[in-house]
Curated annotation (Swiss-Prot):
Function: Specifically methylates the guanine in position 1207 of 16S rRNA in the 30S particle.
Domain of life assignment: Bacteria
Record gene name: rsmC
Signal sequence interval, chain numbering: none
UniProt keyword Cell inner membrane, yes or no: no
Localization annotation: Cytoplasm
Annotated GO MF terms: 16S rRNA (guanine(1207)-N(2))-methyltransferase activity; nucleic acid binding
GO CC term, one of those recorded: cytoplasm
HAMAP family registered for this protein in UniProt: 16SrRNA_methyltr_C
Protein name in the entry: Ribosomal RNA small subunit methyltransferase C
Phylogenetic lineage: Bacteria, Pseudomonadati, Pseudomonadota, Gammaproteobacteria, Vibrionales
Subunit structure: Monomer.
Length: 339
């Protein structure tokens, strides 16, 4: 089994976990929890990633929680935090989990050095001591313990609020840390919205993030039936809050590409992700494009924005027979295809 670099450095330090009830959280991407479970009293996972949750949900040996906040009761006395790409998300997870588990909780933090994992030294200072105990494969391994009472966690305090102006409409956006375009209006999304035709029927917003695209589409096309999906529980929570803030209706839910969606969409609209953690990752978008025809109605349309360097047109052409470029600027292109 090939593990990620953070898991490999953790594997070197299994003695830290002996006799512990370990709760794993953060940017975990491999099957290392199964290995860890052999060396500790119990292992559970809290993940905001729906795809990762689905991988572990079927295994009885490891309990897996999915959501934007851990609300279930757990007997964990140690956190293993895989440092996420966004520092703000790390702080969110750390604060939320320590508030849940309480004083005396031990913590191990692992991550690639380029991800900014060193920030844990300052971030954890108010909770207790933490020190680096290992470095390998350009990763660091920290161990610490919460010796102070953690403050009460209220998720509402973590939403960043900002406004998006589009065609004389003002959209109130509420976004949690770790969500794409957190706190700002992404230029690719703006070009996509400027290019969209009038929408009708059942519309899917794939990779909804904080809900900007879906909210604008619903504001301009109030009669559409809107589904908004994302793999991230933080995005789902953000989109729900954004719709609520604008008195809009839509169905927001987690889906690993089309795993939980309906079929027969008139439009699939997306600013799809192409990063997973610190690495460029295209597989979910490729699946989005390849399977789009079978999820569209007759003459249904796929419209997406992408960075100009991404080679999506050949995939779209293979799936649909043709790929049109509706608009472009020096960074983004808008692609479209019709069933």
């Amino acid at each position: 089994m090939s593990y990620s670099a953070p898991s490999q450095i953790t594997q070197r330090q299994l003695a830290y976990f002996e006799g512990k009830h370990v709760l794993i959280a953060g940017e975990l991407i491999d099957d290392f929890p199964f290995e860890l479970a052999k060396h500790c009293e119990s292992t559970s996972i809290f993940t905001t990633n729906y795809s990762y949750y689905k991988q572990f949900a079927e295994h009885d040996s490891i309990h897996c929680y999915f959501g934007s906040e851990l609300t279930e009761t757990t007997n964990a006395d140690m956190i293993l935090l895989y440092w996420p790409k966004a520092k703000a998300e790390a702080e969110y997870l750390l604060t939320m989990l320590l508030a849940k588990l309480g004083k005396s909780t031990e913590i191990v933090v692992v991550g690639e050095n380029r991800s900014g994992v060193k920030s844990i030294e300052k971030m954890f200072a108010d909770f207790g001591p933490i020190n680096k105990f290992d470095s390998a494969r350009r990763c660091s391994f920290y161990w610490g313990q919460c010796t102070e009472e953690a403050p009460t966690f209220n998720q509402q305090d973590w939403f960043k609020e900002y406004q998006v102006e589009f065609e004389n409409h003002t959209i109130e956006v509420r976004s949690l840390p770790g969500v794409f375009s957190h706190g700002e209006f992404d230029k690719g999304s703006e070009l996509l919205l400027q290019t969209l035709p009038a929408l009708r029927g059942h519309v899917l917003d794939f990779g909804c993030g904080a809900g900007v695209i879906g909210s604008v589409m619903k504001t301009i096309n109030p009669k559409i039936h809107l589904d908004m999906v994302d793999i991230s529980a933080l995005a789902i929570a953000s989109s729900i809050e954004t719709l609520k803030a604008n008195n809009l209706e839509g169905c927001v839910f987690a889906s690993d590409v089309y795993s939980d969606t309906k079929e027969n969409y008139q439009f699939i609209v997306s600013n799809p992700p192409f990063h997973a953690g610190l690495k460029t990752h295209y597989s979910s978008t490729e699946e989005l494009l390849e399977k789009a025809p079978q999820n569209l109605t007759h003459e249904g349309q796929l419209i997406l924005v992408a960075n100009s360097f991404l080679q999506y047109p050949p995939i779209i052409e293979k799936a649909f027979g043709e790929c049109l470029t509706l608009a472009k600027n020096n960074k983004f292109k808008i692609y479209s295809a019709q069933k």
